[in-house]
């Protein structure tokens, strides 16, 4: 079907309950995959589905057959258009556990549990301060990184904050807090600096500074977005702090202050 594709985009009609069209574009070696004549294929979803799961592509003698299962958008909390909307992303979930390291008592601690605990605290702080708050994960299950980004875009969020925990197995003494932003986003960089400064001041965490990264949730979101690496689980002392409810509260109060500091630097909504 795509064998005659030339440089420049073209589209194919489809008969599908999930997809409205298939677009394709023949590239040279400009997508970074290291292969000549890269073909990029985009599947456009019909209304009523926010993303598709279980996509299969089967080649046949007469063409290519594409099937998928639609996934309906999850129910969202009420959003007041007169307030700022912040999407909070608790890193990992029940399938992608994230880092797993033992605490001082030898009990395995899961990154997914720490991030969700911190996000719940941050949610409560921001709600109390008058923000709209949307969670990408409220429990053990969540969409993948692209689905989390799409959710933030769909609710037209003003800010996106992803909470994670770091690890450095070869340097167990390493500790501290990093905040990441997408390399080409000046607004995300400014947001990252505001969060980094406030979170470190509130918690006393070692300030590792801000850094750029090509993370999916930073690249695919349309708003100012940051990913906070709250500390190193491979450092037993820092892991003890990360597990402490009081420390988590101070840390998230700092992140919330960074949210406010950044938004206060912008024209009023």
Feature roles, as predicted:
Residues 1-85:
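Signal-peptide-cleaved, periplasmic/extracellular N-terminal interaction regions immediately downstream
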Residues 40, 116-123, 146-149, 189-196, ...:
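Extracytoplasmic/secreted envelope proteins and their assembly/folding machinery
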Residues 68-151, 155-157, 169, 175, ...:
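Active-site histidine-acidic residue metal-binding/catalytic motifs
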Residues 85-89, 132-137, 159-163, 171, ...:
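Structural recognition of the beta-strand scaffold that forms the well-ordered cores
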Residues 92-95, 109, 138-143, 165-170, ...:
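Solvent-exposed loop/turn segments at secondary-structure junctions
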Residues 120-132, 153-157, 196-205, 243, ...:
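Sec-exported extracytoplasmic/periplasmic mature domains
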Residues 162-170, 211-269:
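Active-site-adjacent mobile loop/cap segments within catalytic or ligand-binding domains
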């Amino acid at each position: 079907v795509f064998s005659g594709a030339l440089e420049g985009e073209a589209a194919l009609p489809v008969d599908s309950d999930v997809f409205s069209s298939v677009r394709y574009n023949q590239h040279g070696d400009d997508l970074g995959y290291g292969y000549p004549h890269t073909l990029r294929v985009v599947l456009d979803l019909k209304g009523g589905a926010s993303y598709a799961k279980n996509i299969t592509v089967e080649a046949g003698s007469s063409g290519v057959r594409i099937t998928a299962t639609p996934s309906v958008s999850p129910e969202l909390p009420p959003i007041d258009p007169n307030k700022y909307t912040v999407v909070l992303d608790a890193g990992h979930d029940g399938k992608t556990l994230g880092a797993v390291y033992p605490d001082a008592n030898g009990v395995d601690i899961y990154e997914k549990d720490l991030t969700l605990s911190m996000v719940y605290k941050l949610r409560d702080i921001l709600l109390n301060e008058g923000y709209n708050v949307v969670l990408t994960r409220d429990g053990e299950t969540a969409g993948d990184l692209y689905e989390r980004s799409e959710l933030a875009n769909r609710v037209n969020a003003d800010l996106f904050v992803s909470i994670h925990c770091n690890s450095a197995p070869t340097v167990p003494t390493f500790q501290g807090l990093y905040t990441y932003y997408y390399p080409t986003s000046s607004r995300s960089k400014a947001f990252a600096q505001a969060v980094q400064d406030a979170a470190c001041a509130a918690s006393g965490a070692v300030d590792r500074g801000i850094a750029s990264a090509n993370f999916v949730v930073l690249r695919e979101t349309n708003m100012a977005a940051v990913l906070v690496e709250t500390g190193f689980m491979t450092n037993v002392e820092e892991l003890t702090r990360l597990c402490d409810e009081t420390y988590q509260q101070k840390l998230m109060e700092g992140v919330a202050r960074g949210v406010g500091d950044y938004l206060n630097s912008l024209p009023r909504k």
